[in-house]
């Protein structure tokens, strides 16, 4: 993996990771962790080996979405061994949720302690060989984002996915997120609009619960790619609540088509960053 200009990446536990993707959102509640989880599953079904690093320290929801809560993190000579969420060991996950004695325990830490854990997650987790490392970040632009960027900056290619919903208030937050990417030199892979209409489970008709097309218009104005829209889907919601593989179990759903298409576009965009 190449180092950024003026920096040198020391050999370490990210040496076998080919691509790193940060998933960002300007505000909470837009389905950022949903997109991170389903992107990882879609990439796995394309034959990729994927890791998920959950640095949303105060809201670690991905272990539940992948039915991995309660699993233990073990030590090896190279550091922490991530939790494998499938028998094939094609998706590995590291989250603060595995380090809490009680899953309902609140993480009430000051900045330095959060920074130290994020740095440890980046340097001390034995990821092995991965095609993609998906990093699920907290909402907004906080100290955790800066700590994550500083830890990952020496590694390339590194890009960001920005998740939004159609509402105007969410779009305004995404503008600030794109400004954050520009100021920190983080390349934007593209914008994803989540909750883009509701798909009826009976007739498959899509109804716009909110406005429509705002994410695509924002991407156009910002000069970044628009990767697609994901509709509200009751099957997707149920899969996340039950920790099931939506991509495998519901290939005929509208959300499946959207998510797999987005995953393919992400692969193409990350390949372009390598060239």
From Swiss-Prot:
Cofactor binding note from Swiss-Prot or TrEMBL: Binds 4 [4Fe-4S] clusters per heterotetramer. Contains two stable clusters in the N-termini of NUBP1 and two labile, bridging clusters between subunits of the NUBP1-NUBP2 heterotetramer.
Record bears the keyword ATP-binding: yes
Binding-site positions, [4Fe-4S] cluster: 200, 203
Single GO BP term: cell projection organization
GO terms, molecular function: 4 iron, 4 sulfur cluster binding; ATP binding; ATP-dependent FeS chaperone activity; metal ion binding
Places the protein is found: Nucleus; Cytoplasm, Cytoskeleton, Microtubule organizing center, Centrosome; Cytoplasm; Cytoplasm, Cytoskeleton, Cilium axoneme
Tissue expression as described in the entry: Widely expressed.
Keyword Ligase: no
Keywords: 4Fe-4S, Acetylation, ATP-binding, Cell projection, Cilium, Cilium biogenesis/degradation, Cytoplasm, Cytoskeleton, Iron, Iron-sulfur, Metal-binding, Nucleotide-binding, Nucleus
Cystine bridges: none
InterPro entries linked: Mrp-like_CS, Mrp/NBP35_ATP-bd, NUBP2/Cfd1_eukaryotes, P-loop_NTPase, YlxH/NBP35
Residues modified as N-acetylmethionine: 1
Residues binding ATP: 26-33
Similarity remark: Belongs to the Mrp/NBP35 ATP-binding proteins family. NUBP2/CFD1 subfamily.
Function: Component of the cytosolic iron-sulfur (Fe/S) protein assembly (CIA) machinery. Required for maturation of extramitochondrial Fe-S proteins. The NUBP1-NUBP2 heterotetramer forms a Fe-S scaffold complex, mediating the de novo assembly of an Fe-S cluster and its transfer to target apoproteins. Negatively regulates cilium formation and structure.
Protein name from the UniProt record: Cytosolic Fe-S cluster assembly factor NUBP2
């Amino acid at each position: 993996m190449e180092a950024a200009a003026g920096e040198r990446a020391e050999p370490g536990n990210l040496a076998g990771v080919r691509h790193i993707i940060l998933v960002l959102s300007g505000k909470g509640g837009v389905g950022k962790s949903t997109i991170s989880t389903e992107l990882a599953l879609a990439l796995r079904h394309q034959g990729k080996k994927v890791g998920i690093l959950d640095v949303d320290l105060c809201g670690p929801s991905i272990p539940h979405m992948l039915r991995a809560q309660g699993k233990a993190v073990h030590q090896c000579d190279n550091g922490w061994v991530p939790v494998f969420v499938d028998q094939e060991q094609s998706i590995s996950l590291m989250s603060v949720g595995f380090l809490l004695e009680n899953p309902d325990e609140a993480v009430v830490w000051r900045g330095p302690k959060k920074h130290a854990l994020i740095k440890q997650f980046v340097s001390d987790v034995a990821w092995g060989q991965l095609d993609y490392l998906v990093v699920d970040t907290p909402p907004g632009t906080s100290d955790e984002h800066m700590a994550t960027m500083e830890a990952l900056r020496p590694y390339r290619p590194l890009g960001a996915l920005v998740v939004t919903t159609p509402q105007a208030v969410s779009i305004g937050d995404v503008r600030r997120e794109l400004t954050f990417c520009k100021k920190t030199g983080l390349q934007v892979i593209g914008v994803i609009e989540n909750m883009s209409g509701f798909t009826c489970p009976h007739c498959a008709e899509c109804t716009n619960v909110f406005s429509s097309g705002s994410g695509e218009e924002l991407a156009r104005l910002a000069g970044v790619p628009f990767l697609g829209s994901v509709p509200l889907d009751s099957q997707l919601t149920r899969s996340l609540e039950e920790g099931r593989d939506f991509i495998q179990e519901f290939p005929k759903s509208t959300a499946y088509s959207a998510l797999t298409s987005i995953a393919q576009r992400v692969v193409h965009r990350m390949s372009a960053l390598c060239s």
